[in-house]
Every structure is written in structure tokens, then in C-alpha cells.
């Protein structure tokens, strides 16, 4: 594998997608860019002491470091990037490990080898969220990819047995939250299998739904979150992957590298979550991206605690398959009050899936890098 650690050009290749193809070229359609991606591989794994699972679950994360603050932060060095992308794995029996990683760029031809207290408002003006009712919507794609965590957050199905969510939903930066050892993922389904007792199909009332729960086998959390939660670098790594004990048998949404905001269709993002002010309801929303940094998307989508961990997605044209495709390009993290030219302004924040994060998450899902070369 190629790459000279610490070399500035090498670092630039790691942090920026390699060989990006213009998303538009001769096509009028907003098209998924083609990327040649870096590789994130485990180098060593060692056992850690069992955690105490003593943290209180937080349904949102706040930070005072806004877009300008993040834009002024230096890019991580190669060694720092390796530290941030190293990760902890928690197993259902309470044991855990730490895995240190290496980061590489493949040579051509190698790819075929194996502050002040404020009341936080997350509703901006008129509440533009939509509660999704009826099994014809809730049980069909893309809404069916949204699931509920037993800790109170939202997650998104990204593979046959995997759920993407926010790290703070299971870990507070110091230890795991209460209930994580017996973490479950809930799938909405009709309350009545045969329809008896359910609302009549012509009724104006929404059909009653319930959650069916599946236990989690193991979780992965990047060390960038665990090491950095005490400062503002942590929010850049507020994501986690959950592996279920059995397949969920539903259609899932693939992850993708987040394009620049100006390349998103209409500059807009979408996500659905289980906001805690509408218990039992799946809530969908969309809005424009207001600002961005390399790791974060700043927007003012209406959201409440409980929506944290929702997969942020867009729909773009897939040139190779000649079809439209939705992909998860970020994870909804939480809320920020920031000072903009001396005036307070608030944003909702999503963690972008960068090329390095894509390589890491994809490896967690696939278990190899060969299947993780297309973002």
C-alpha cells in the first residue's frame, strides 16, 4: 500500500476524496460523485476493563463552537487521524476492546487485492415536521429504515444487521450509558397482525403501531468521540455503529460520502426520527443546509431530542446503474448556540460522512476494505 505518514500531500489525500468526478459534467441531474477512497484497517486490538455503564442517556449534544470556530481548527495530522479513527467495541456480555488502525492510500492496481444557559429551541418558526402515519408509509422505504434505540435515540438501517446512530446515544465520552449492555433496537410494525381490532381502513385515525425489539450484539464507537468529548473535536466523531444479533429483513439505506452542500439537490437534506415530543410517532423533515465545515453540516431542520442519531440522507442520480438512489451522508447529532458577529444564533448539527469515516464505517459493516472502495 502507498502512503508516507506525516507527509502533507499524503494527509491531503486522506482528508479529501481522491479522484473525485464532477457530479454534473454533461448531466443535468444531481449525480453522486465517484470517489477513490482511502483505506482504514485494524492494526492491533487489545482488551479493556469492563465499563460501569453509569452515564445518563443524553438525547442531544450541545456545543458552543460554531461554523467559524470549526473552520479555524487545524486539520488533524496523520497520527491524530489514526487516533481519532481507532475505536472501542462493546460486546453484549459487557466486555470491550480497543482497536488501533492504520490509514492508507492504495496504489493503482492494488484495489483488487484483498457558556450562558439558554433555553434550547430546535423548532424554527412554524413547525415544519411531518408525523408519518399508516403502515403503507411507515413500513415502506425510506421511512422503514428509521429505528428506535432503547436508550431513546433514533438509528438508521445501513446493512442487513447494522444500524448507524450517534455516539452520544450510547456513550457520553467517558463511559457507556445505562442500558447499553442490554441495548435493543425497535422496529415499528402493526399492532394487530390479522387486522382484528385495528382501525378501519376508511378511518381518519392513524393505524396503531408497536415496536418489535432486537438485541444488539456489539457496538463500535470511534476514539475521536471518546477522547474528544470534553472539547469541540468530539462532535466531529459523534457516530456509532450497532450490529444486531440477527438480520432485520428490511430494506436498508447505504451510506455515502457527503458531497459539498452546493452539490446537494436544492442544497437540501432529509431525515426521519423519533422526536420525544411526539411519542410513538416517526417524524420526517427536510431543510436547507445553512453552512458546513469538513466534518459538520449546519442546518435549521426542526427537531427535538430523540431525533439524535437519525440518518441524514439525499437522493441523487447513480450514473453507473442509471437510477436514482438515496444514501446516508450524515448523522444528526444535536443543537448548538453560537455567537455570530456577537449575536447568538442556533443551529442543528449533523456529522458528515467524510471519505475517512466512510472507509471506517464500511469496514465495520463489511469486514474488509475491498468492498469499501466506492463512496
From Swiss-Prot:
This is Serine protease 23. Its EC number is 3.4.21.-. It comes from Bos taurus. It is an enzyme of class 3 (hydrolase). GO terms for cellular component: extracellular region. Belongs to the peptidase S1 family. The keyword Lipid biosynthesis does not apply. It is found in: Secreted. One of its GO terms (molecular function) is serine-type endopeptidase activity. The active site is at residues 168, 232, 308. PANTHER family: SERINE PROTEASE, SERINE PROTEASE 23. Keywords: Disulfide bond, Glycoprotein, Hydrolase, Protease, Secreted, Serine protease, Signal. Disulfide bonds join 153-169. The lineage of its organism: Eukaryota, Metazoa, Chordata, Craniata, Vertebrata. InterPro entries: Glutamyl_endopeptidase, Peptidase_S1_PA, Peptidase_S1_PA_chymotrypsin, Trypsin_dom, TRYPSIN_HIS. One of its GO terms (biological process) is proteolysis. Residues 1-23 form the signal peptide. Glycans are attached at residues 93, 199. Gene3D superfamilies: Trypsin-like serine proteases. It holds the Pfam family Trypsin.
Amino acid at each position: 500500500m502507498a502512503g508516507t505518514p506525516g507527509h502533507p500531500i499524503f494527509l491531503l489525500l486522506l482528508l479529501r476524496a481522491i479522484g473525485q468526478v464532477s457530479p454534473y459534467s454533461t448531466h443535468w441531474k444531481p449525480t453522486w460523485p465517484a470517489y477513490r477512497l482511502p483505506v482504514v484497517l485494524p492494526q492491533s486490538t487489545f482488551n479493556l476493563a469492563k465499563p460501569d455503564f453509569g452515564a445518563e442517556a443524553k438525547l442531544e449534544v450541545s456545543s458552543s463552537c460554531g461554523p467559524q470556530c470549526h473552520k479555524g481548527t487545524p486539520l488533524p495530522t496523520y497520527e491524530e487521524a489514526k487516533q481519532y479513527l481507532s475505536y472501542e467495541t462493546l460486546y453484549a456480555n459487557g466486555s470491550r476492546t480497543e482497536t488501533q488502525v492504520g490509514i492508507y492510500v492504495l496504489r493503482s492496481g492494488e484495489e483488487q487485492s484483498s457558556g450562558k444557559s439558554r433555553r434550547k429551541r430546535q423548532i424554527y418558526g412554524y413547525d415544519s415536521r411531518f408525523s408519518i402515519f399508516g403502515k403503507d408509509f411507515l413500513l415502506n422505504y425510506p421511512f422503514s429504515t428509521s429505528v428506535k434505540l432503547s436508550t431513546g435515540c433514533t438509528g438508521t438501517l445501513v446493512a442487513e444487521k447494522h444500524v448507524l446512530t450517534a455516539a452520544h446515544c450510547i456513550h457520553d465520552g467517558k463511559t457507556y450509558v445505562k442500558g447499553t449492555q442490554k441495548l435493543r433496537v425497535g422496529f415499528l410494525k402493526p399492532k394487530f397482525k390479522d387486522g382484528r381490532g385495528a382501525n378501519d381502513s376508511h378511518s381518519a385515525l392513524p393505524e396503531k403501531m408497536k415496536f418489535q425489539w432486537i438485541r444488539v450484539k456489539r457496538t463500535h464507537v470511534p476514539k475521536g468521540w471518546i477522547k474528544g468529548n470534553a472539547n469541540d473535536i468530539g462532535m466531529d466523531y459523534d457516530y456509532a455503529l450497532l450490529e444486531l444479533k440477527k438480520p432485520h429483513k428490511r430494506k436498508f439505506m447505504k451510506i455515502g460520502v457527503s458531497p459539498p452542500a452546493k452539490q446537494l439537490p436544492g442544497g437540501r437534506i432529509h431525515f426521519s426520527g423519533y422526536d420525544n415530543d411526539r411519542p410513538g410517532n416517526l417524524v420526517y423533515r427536510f431543510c436547507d443546509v445553512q453552512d458546513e465545515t469538513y466534518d459538520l453540516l449546519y442546518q435549521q431542520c426542526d427537531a427535538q431530542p430523540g431525533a439524535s442519531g437519525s440518518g441524514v440522507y439525499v437522493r441523487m442520480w447513480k450514473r453507473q446503474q442509471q437510477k436514482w438512489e438515496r444514501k446516508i451522508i450524515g448523522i444528526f447529532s444535536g443543537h448548538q448556540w453560537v455567537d455570530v458577529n456577537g449575536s447568538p444564533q442556533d443551529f442543528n448539527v449533523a456529522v458528515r460522512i467524510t471519505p475517512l469515516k466512510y472507509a471506517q464505517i464500511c469496514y465495520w459493516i463489511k469486514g474488509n476494505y475491498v468492498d469499501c472502495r466506492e463512496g
